[in-house]
Amino acid sequence: MERLKRMSVFAKVVEFGSFTAAARQLQMSVSSISQTVSKLEDELQVKLLNRSTRSIGLTEAGRIYYQGCRRMLHEVQDVHEQLYAFNNTPIGTLRIGCSSTMAQNVLAGLTAKMLKEYPGLSVNLVTGIPAPDLIADGLDVVIRVGALQDSSLFSRRLGAMPMVVCAAKSYLTQYGIPEKPADLSSHSWLEYSVRPDNEFELIAPEGISTRLIPQGRFVTNDPMTLVRWLTAGAGIAYVPLMWVINEINRGELEILLPRYQSDPRPVYALYTEKDKLPLKVQVVINSLTDYFVEVGKLFQEMHGRGKEK
């Protein structure tokens, strides 16, 4: 048990990057943290950390030991969580990886509600473009939008994210409303340069498909910048509904070409274990599944309102 405590202290030092930060997190003194690491090094007869007055770094032996510590500590935590699961109460830290837009537009609000419902649960939300790596980043679950490529991982489809062509009402007042896909070529286009969202198809009610690869003077790989351009009236864009759902509800943006359909992006949860899915992971999967059902209904309502205009 004492060795497990020392391993936990060492792992915290590595993860927080300093003895001081680890001491603050563990509510221990800095000297106690330092002594614990020194005892580990004496016991193992290897140097785990390179220390300087400004920073610490892992030695090669320290890197190997840290990886082992992390695996063992996760296993201990999982055992405790499985026992608590008998009471249908998820506990522990849920480590989720996703894109920054998924975090900002979906998971921030969703996890806030989850933690109110489950006081024994905490969340570590890791973001990035592309989404963080499930194995390398030590995550419980990764949420991905679009086609999957990780054949070694287990996955579950959570739903689909509708895609919309939209623009600010101020832009449409000045430049007019496009009635068909061909009209988009005469408008200012806001281009999201990350594939596959920079090319798409629109399908007419009679089944005729039009493939579009529009280019514009405004190009970015940052979703937030694209939305800012949209609301500023800089042009028209093709984006996931979750990026602009609040702006549409507030009346700042309007969905265009409502008679035309576009394939939604599939959304998946990726994880490593098929049969022993921790309760905390199951909870977030269920919550996201419910979310995308509601988003689908909302999209149909929005499209219906657009067709009536």
From Swiss-Prot:
Gene3D superfamilies cross-referenced by the UniProt entry: 3.40.190.290, Winged helix-like DNA-binding domain superfamily/Winged helix DNA-binding domain
Molecular functions (GO terms): DNA-binding transcription factor activity; transcription cis-regulatory region binding
DNA-binding region: 19-38
Knockout consequences: The mutant is hypersensitive to p-hydroxybenzoic acid.
CDD domains reported in the protein's UniProt record: PBP2_CrgA_like
DNA-binding as UniProt keyword: yes
Alphabetically ordered keywords of this record: Activator, DNA-binding, Transcription, Transcription regulation
One of the Pfam families matching this protein, by short name: HTH_1
Top-level division of the source organism's lineage: Bacteria
Activity regulation statement: Activity is regulated by p-hydroxybenzoic acid.
GO biological process: DNA-templated transcription; DNA-templated transcription initiation; positive regulation of DNA-templated transcription; regulation of DNA-templated transcription
Family from the record: Belongs to the LysR transcriptional regulatory family.
PANTHER family: HTH-TYPE TRANSCRIPTIONAL ACTIVATOR TTDR-RELATED (PTHR30537:SF5), HTH-TYPE TRANSCRIPTIONAL REGULATOR (PTHR30537)
Official protein name in the record: HTH-type transcriptional activator AaeR
Protein's organism: Escherichia coli (strain K12)
Organism lineage: Bacteria, Pseudomonadati, Pseudomonadota, Gammaproteobacteria, Enterobacterales
Gene: aaeR
